Amino acid sequence: MSSLLLLHGLGANGRVWDAWPQPRVAPDLPGHGSAPGLPSYTFGSMAAAVARTLPVRRNVVIVGHSLGGVIALELAGGGYDVDVDRVIALGVKVSWPADDLGRAKALAQKPVAWFDSRDEAAARFLKVSGLHGLVDPADPVVDHGLRQVDEHWRLAMDPGTFAVGAPDMAKLIADSRAEVVLARGERDPMNTDDELRALHDQVVTLPGLGHNAQVEDPEAVAALLR
């Protein structure tokens, strides 16, 4: 069983890693894909839910994208009976102005949106997950991110996940028992080189790639493990 754990970002699901070139475990985060939701979402509650599903708990290496990167760091803090050797946190948003947090909270409070067609629901999934233009609407990751009830469609994602909040990255990195690398695509609008370097001394920028670097060029991200 692989000890490589891949954690997706907000709005996506584990199928986003299908093109990854190495053996791995790629679960759905709570409230995404087929994973059960939680009464409320914090980085700790999400990490605990992920930890309970892991088939391997020792010498784990984690690549986490965006929200998944934060969950990876939370797991690396040692509070979940998971021995993490290394974390690559990719594309994590580290600056959270009040306006951004307010918008996220408002989204979390909205009711589930229903659509009359799969096409409409797929378009919404691709927008929410940041995969528009990168993934075909017919891709399995889209199917896994949708639910059909009778003749209507919705996202599998629990809107409450938007309320997970802003991570204390400095504390997460300081508390990590694992080696930590902060990585970003050169064109990622969610963060900057300077923001990451202010937090940590191991920063890698992937040339020409954007926020979903793991989808744009899985090999380039996988190379960070070598």
For the regions a language model picked out, list residue spans one by one.
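Active-site loop/oxyanion-hole signature of alpha/beta-hydrolase fold enzymes
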Residues: 25-63, 77, 223
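Catalytic histidine-centered segment of alpha/beta-hydrolase-like enzymes
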Residues: 209-218, 222
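Conserved serine/cysteine hydrolase catalytic core
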Residues: 148-199, 205
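Gly/Ala-rich beta-loop-alpha elbow adjacent to hydrolase catalytic centers
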Residues: 64-68, 72
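Conserved alpha/beta-hydrolase catalytic His-Asp/Glu region
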Residues: 116-169
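The conserved beta1-alpha1 loop
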Residues: 5-9, 65, 184
